[in-house]
């Protein structure tokens, strides 16, 4: 059953075929509904569960990530990335990640690259790391107002594919992260090279986060896939918010809060879990935002040929918001 198209549709973008075609009044509607859905879907509570799975998947994810990345890049490349991330992450969190990465790399050097043990460990690492992706898939399914309809194997294979995609995107980001400074050294630049290199690196990180979120928003929910233009807006907004929020979070932890006095030896874990929770909130918020953008228009936002409302296989595409 479809909903009737609201009055003054031309002022609210009910016939918009792209995000850019939604007028100001429509954007106000989208933002209001996004805030309401954040509360209705208990996003902050759901994000705590997703953040917990992120923490559990940290070691397996680093194992899988480094196992592939070390085939393409030296270990120093990943340490360079952690040094840059230290600018937006609390010191205790960066130290914990660095320690875990060193352990993984040391274990890798003690084993034969083609051994059965390594291959088996890599597969298990993929599967364990996919637990966090499965949690995120469930969260974005809720954000898009859907219920899980996929079979057990379809759900888990999708999660595994998204996990592999995330690792591949991360590796390409690190390759670009390393190659950009090398390329700039051959250009006739002034003495401000160091500043320029550091500034150029950040769009690479933002781009990697945006691509990863776009893939998650498109393939993660249990629904017919949305067209690319209806997922990238939320991905871009979430990426920028994640970077800015991480900077503010780091400032708060290092200058205002004293988690070590309260949590003692567990302070690093607590801070890392809080950052994972914040990252999950931002990622789910991007999905909520995308969902309300689709909900604003009566035009088919799903892939393939245009279908009438009620036959699109996605709640927000099959219904138009009343306000």
Regions found by a protein language model. Give the residues of each.
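Membrane-embedded alpha-helices and immediately adjacent juxtamembrane helical segments
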Residues: 1-323
């Amino acid at each position: 059953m479809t909903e009737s198209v609201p009055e003054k549709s031309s002022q609210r973008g009910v016939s918009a075929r792209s995000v850019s075609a939604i007028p100001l009044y429509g954007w106000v509607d989208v933002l209001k509904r996004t805030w309401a859905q954040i509360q209705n879907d208990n996003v902050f509570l759901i994000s705590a569960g997703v953040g917990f799975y992120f923490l559990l998947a940290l070691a397996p994810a680093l194992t899988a990530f480094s196992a592939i990345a070390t085939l393409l890049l030296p270990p120093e490349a990943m340490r360079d990335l952690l040094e840059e991330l230290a600018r937006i992450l609390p010191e205790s969190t960066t130290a914990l990640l660095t320690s875990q990465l060193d352990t993984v790399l040391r274990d890798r050097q003690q084993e034969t690259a083609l051994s059965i043990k390594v291959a088996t460990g890599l597969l298990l690492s993929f599967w364990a790391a996919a637990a966090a992706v499965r949690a995120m898939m469930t969260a974005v399914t809720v954000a898009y107002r859907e219920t899980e309809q996929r079979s057990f194997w379809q759900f888990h294979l999708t999660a595994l594919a998204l996990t592999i995609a995330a690792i591949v995107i991360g590796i390409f980001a690190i390759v670009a992260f390393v190659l950009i400074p090398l390329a700039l050294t051959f250009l006739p630049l002034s003495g401000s090279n160091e500043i320029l290199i550091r500034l150029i690196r950040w769009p690479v990180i933002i781009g990697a986060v945006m691509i990863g979120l776009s893939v998650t928003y498109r393939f993660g929910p249990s629904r017919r896939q949305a067209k690319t233009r209806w997922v990238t807006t939320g991905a871009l907004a979430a990426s920028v918010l994640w970077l800015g929020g991480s900077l503010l979070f780091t400032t708060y932890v290092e200058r205002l809060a004293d988690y070590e006095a309260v949590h003692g030896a567990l302070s690093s874990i607590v801070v890392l879990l809080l950052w994972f929770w914040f990252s999950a909130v931002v990622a789910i918020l991007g999905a909520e935002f995308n969902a309300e953008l689709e909900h604003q228009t009566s035009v088919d936002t799903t892939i393939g040929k245009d279908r009438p409302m009620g036959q699109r296989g996605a709640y927000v595409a099959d219904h138009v918001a009343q306000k």
